Amino acid sequence: LGDVYKRQAEGYLRAHGAEDLLILSRGEYPHAFINRPTFRRIEKDDLFVFSVEIAGVYGYWTQIIRPIFLSRGSHREAYEVLCQVKEAIQAGVEKFRPGNLICDVDEAINRVARKYELSKGVWAGHSMGIDLGDGYNIGESNKMEIVPNMILTFHPSLLDKNGEGVLYADTYVSTEGGARCLTDKYRESPYWEDLKELVK
């Protein structure tokens, strides 16, 4: 069903002004990685990760990734890691302000990962702009200074000791007053029954 959802999402997004888009998903373990949607059937207790990267009418890209738990109480370890990923993102967002460096953002994310003894992938996110990915990553080697109106998508790939993780992403713009989220929809709950109510 992943491919079915992809087609429905693409139709909706294009009807609402998306010029270009990339839709990726994941319906099986490990949930910290995404790929092209497949024809794998989604089961009632599944955890389904859905990523949408959209270019609007002016050509600028944004990205949102949301995990969807098909039943409440399933995938408890994954849910726990999801909460930790959100905490790590928030720590990074607090450092995403003009005058700091990209590596400061990465270190804030790393502190949360260490607190929960999570392993971290190569990066914690990337820039967004006129080109998808726009050329630089959130990583410890990136000494680039953060400037006003810089845009980053945060999606640290954090894994617990069993290799479980959940990809989640929001896109932010840096401002003098702090980072502002550009993808603040569907953050209240990761559960399908709650999300259905939000989109009615």
Placement of each model-derived feature along the sequence:
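Active-site neighborhoods and metal-handling regions in enzymes and metal-associated proteins
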Residues: 2-200
